[in-house]
Amino acid sequence: MRRMRIAAVGVVLALVVVGCAKRGLSPRTGMIDVPGGKVWYQAVGSGSKTPLLLLHGGPGVPSYYLKPLAALADERPVVFFDQLGCGRSPAPADSSLWTIDRFVRELAAVRTALGLEKVHLYGTSWGTILALEYMKTHPSGVESIVMASPALDLHQWVRDADSLRHTLPDSTRLVIEDAERKHTTDSPAYQAAMMEYYRLYIARRQPWPADLDSAFTQIGQSVYTTMDGPSEFTITGTLRDYDGRDFLKELSVPVLYTCGEFDEALPRTVASFAEATPGAEMQIFANAAHCTAEDDSATYVPAIRAFLRRADAKQGGR
């Protein structure tokens, strides 16, 4: 997800953590104190299975677009939260907060506040980075991870995005390249050209549902620009050299990689992450893009449900 008023979905776009609360997690909405501020959360469902906590993408694209995953709440609590600086979580005027380490501590604070002793993680786009980094220091009680449209190697991400840019009509591609060269990415022409890219590789469902529109409208620009950069194709922020591949071999919990057939997280790149992860599964969803749950909820949600059930069984869960 990238910068832009229309918003962007790039390294880029969410993570979900599912967990089991000490005294049970009841449906509720509230705010949680985290390092640097407060974050909004909503827990839905009251099923008996291990809860699911969702880590959205961006960085800075709030959790609205993950709404289809609420359908899993008939079996387990599902927890949505907007990371600090976007959506319903107020943005402090301090860009020094936008670091991987602080977001890991934020996730730890959310999990502690909600009493999630056992959890399944679901991360999408940037959320997969957050999930992976969280596992380095807080692996206890994490029972599985869904890596949705992962952005685990940012140099590869840029190469893949550039290859997709060259599939656009020349008239569209040249507008994008000219605006990025001149640093005029707020221009209406650039926004219109990028929307063509989004409709192909971010979300193919037309028209965009209200929740997806809200996610883009309420993007945290400071978070996105500081960590990512100006666009889907130019990563100049603090994530620019991120590569988490070396840690994938250390993962010992069940892992499912997902992506859309037309995802900006290219299926061949996602497959390389799956191959580097012991025992990992992978599923590609036909005719879907980066926001796979929005593009094909009828197929996607049952696939996530089935994976979580398998993970529960492996961990001796219900």
What is each stretch, according to the model?
Residues 264-269:
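Conserved alpha/beta-hydrolase "acid-adjacent" motif
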Residues 117-163:
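Conserved hydrolase catalytic core segment
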Residues 279-318:
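Catalytic active-site module of serine/aspartate enzymes centered on a nucleophile-bearing elbow/loop
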Residues 213-244:
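Hydrophobic, aromatic-rich cap/lid helix
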Residues 37-91:
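Conserved HGGG/HGGXW glycine-rich cap/lid loop of the alpha/beta-hydrolase fold
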Residues 83-126:
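Active-site loop/oxyanion-hole signature of alpha/beta-hydrolase fold enzymes
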Residues 155-219:
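Helix-rich cap/lid subdomain of alpha/beta-hydrolase
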Residues 251, 257-259:
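Short beta-strand/loop motif that positions the catalytic acidic residue
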